[in-house]
Amino acid sequence: MSTIAITGVSGYIAQRLVQRLEADSDIERIVGIDVAEPKFRFQKLDFYRLDIRDPHIAQVFSGTDAVVHLAFVLNPMQDEQLMRDINVEGTRNVLNAVEKSGSRKLVYTSSMVAYGARPDNDYPLTEESPLRANTDFSYAEHKLEVELLLQKWKADHPDVTVTIFRFAIVFGRHVQNFISRTLESPRIFAVRGYRPPLQFLHEEDAAESLYFALTHDLDGAYNVCPDDEISFEEILEIAGKKTIELPQSVMFSLAKLGWNAGLLEAPPGEINYLMYPAIMSNRKIVEAGFQFKHSSRDALADALDANRGWVTIGRWRMPENVYRSRVNAVKSVGLAITGGYLLRRLAKRRASKRL
């Protein structure tokens, strides 16, 4: 009988994993920590409201057989030092807790962003491809920093199985973050001359892959992505969106202004991933025995369907009917101002003719 600890246990993927573990007779107990209460409760789950930076998690993890580290700030924060403190120093604290607990397995979810978005990326990216995350994108920088931290920790703890899953962009009905909200914009901003394909990992496959990691010995890094990729044009077609194309220099300048002013959800470094492809190969994990049930198109379709009827502009998200009413109100005000201006011009012209 095993005891599994999970950080970030209140997230949807973690909850799906807990549900899977709940049904496994070999799992006796699940220890979950998060700063937010989980939406669902499970018989085997012992929940602790803790930040991953809290030193008390070492006591909570005592006696666990495996730790799944999912807690990580995805949506970029204006306070980048705080974001790094949670993501990197929080992970360092988790590793300390794993060491003290006697756990023999650690599963960590990294991301395709750790490879970076570069014009000379391998196609496809394999686990042997260099990690060159764009350091002007805090989320990517932290994923890379944590991977390097894990590599060093693994060297000092060779008896612990350390699994690093590099997820593709996770999409599905329950995903709600700055990436998914990009597709809720009335128009999709694009860099002129660039149309990179993308991969989307379905949330259900993401959860199932974590269960697979717990029930198999997978030491090292694994790309976790479906077989297919989607072209930029097909994404626009499926989403029913049109683009606003801007030159690269203009796009980065506007993104920097918007981010510094607190109007945008992500820093300018995100734009690199809208320019250069970061397409991964899943050969290694498939050869290990994992089977994907969903394609990139499935993940995209589910995300779009779940969020249909919503519009996001910068940091503001609203129902589509509210957006349209505000647009119509602005149009009405604009027409009224324009009409008033024209009437005044006409009145002045008539007055001058009388003179």
Residue ranges of each PLM-predicted region?
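N-terminal Rossmann NAD(P)H-binding glycine-rich loop of SDR-like oxidoreductase domains
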Residues: 4-23
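NAD(P)H-binding glycine-rich loop region in Rossmannoid oxidoreductase-like domains
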Residues: 39, 45, 49-89, 97, ...
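Conserved Rossmann-fold NAD(P)-dependent oxidoreductase catalytic core, especially the SDR/UDP-sugar
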Residues: 93-138
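NAD(P)-dependent short-chain dehydrogenase/reductase
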Residues: 153-203
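Amphipathic terminal alpha-helices
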Residues: 296-355
